Amino acid sequence: MTEAHATDAGGPAVPQTRMARHRRIVDILNRQPVRSQSQLAKLLADNGLSVTQATLSRDLDELGAVKIRNTMARLIYAVPARGVPHSAGALGESAKEERMRRLAGELLISAEASANLVVLRTPPGAAQFLASAIDQAELHDILGTIAGDDTLMLISRSPTGGQALADHLLRLAQNDRA
């Protein structure tokens, strides 16, 4: 008995495999904030995939999805990049940059620079998600990232590039919120 199936209501044919379902879930979570399993189930159904609550709960667990607070203090689901069933490297450059922009808009509270360092603040529990998105975007100006619970440190390649990097990330976040 299959717990997920393609819809017959004229929607697109959707593969019924667990991997295809996981890809669809990750895609949705990376594109928009999702606050509940019922909202995610509806979004999946809108995309031609009907899933039981039990299957969805199991899928989210397998993907390592957790709820984090965005900048509006709302709990949303997030999936760490390394939890994606397909490699994040398979995403195009624009998709990686879009994910970074979206997460910056949702999670970045502040950015301060000193020389080649940038300190970013996020809601509790969100720093590693934003750091992962920044790492995946592979921005040339960033030498590396270090993330704690609610704070990230970025190291600029340029000895004086911290302020430009902080300004760039703040602009990305503001543009996403607009």
Swiss-Prot record:
Where does it mainly reside? cytoplasm
* InterPro entries, sorted: Arg_repress, Arg_repress_C, Arg_repress_C_sf, Arg_repress_DNA-bd, WH-like_DNA-bd_sf, WH_DNA-bd_sf
Q: Which UniProt keywords apply?
A: Amino-acid biosynthesis, Arginine biosynthesis, Cytoplasm, DNA-binding, Repressor, Transcription, Transcription regulation
Taken from the UniProt record, the cysteine pairs bridged by disulfide bonds within this chain are none
Q: Which GO terms describe its molecular function?
A: arginine binding; DNA binding; DNA-binding transcription factor activity
Name the Pfam families for this protein: Arg_repressor, Arg_repressor_C
Q: Name one GO biological process term.
A: regulation of arginine biosynthetic process
Which pathway is this protein assigned to?
Answer: Amino-acid biosynthesis; L-arginine biosynthesis [regulation]
User: Cellular component terms, GO, for this chain's entry?
Assistant: cytoplasm
Keyword Hydrolase among record annotations: no
Judging by the UniProt lineage, the source's domain of life is: Bacteria
Q: Where in the cell is it found?
A: Cytoplasm
Sequence similarity: Belongs to the ArgR family.
> What function does the entry list?
Regulates arginine biosynthesis genes.
Q: Which HAMAP family match?
A: Arg_repressor (MF_00173)
Protein name listed in UniProt:
Arginine repressor
From which source organism is this entry?
Streptomyces clavuligerus
Q: Which gene encodes it?
A: argR
